[in-house]
């Protein structure tokens, strides 16, 4: 795992098209902004896990 330190307003770049910017820090919460192409899905981890769980459940008709 790569660990980086960023201050509010600073950005990191992932690949050629994804940027992640630190928008604010309040207590133990960090607000981040993600710019990515429409074809790149961006989810919070808990939402992604829920999507994956729903995909693995058999569909009933």
Swiss-Prot record:
The keyword RNA-binding applies. GO terms for cellular component: cytosol. It comes from the Bacteria. GO terms for molecular function: mRNA 5'-UTR binding. InterPro entries: CsrA, CsrA_sf. One of its GO terms (biological process) is negative regulation of translational initiation. It is found in: Cytoplasm. SUPFAM superfamilies: CsrA-like (SSF117130). Keywords: Activator, Cytoplasm, Repressor, RNA-binding, Translation regulation. Belongs to the CsrA/RsmA family. Controls extracellular enzymes, N-(3-oxohexanoyl)-L-homoserine lactone, and pathogenicity. Repressor of virulence factors. A key translational regulator that binds mRNA to regulate translation initiation and/or mRNA stability. Mediates global changes in gene expression, shifting from rapid growth to stress survival by linking envelope stress, the stringent response and the catabolite repression systems. Usually binds in the 5'-UTR; binding at or near the Shine-Dalgarno sequence prevents ribosome-binding, repressing translation, binding elsewhere in the 5'-UTR can activate translation and/or stabilize the mRNA. Its function is antagonized by small RNA(s). PANTHER family: CARBON STORAGE REGULATOR. Homodimer; the beta-strands of each monomer intercalate to form a hydrophobic core, while the alpha-helices form wings that extend away from the core. This is Translational regulator CsrA. It comes from Pectobacterium carotovorum subsp. carotovorum (Erwinia carotovora subsp. carotovora). The lineage of its organism: Bacteria, Pseudomonadati, Pseudomonadota, Gammaproteobacteria, Enterobacterales. The gene is csrA.
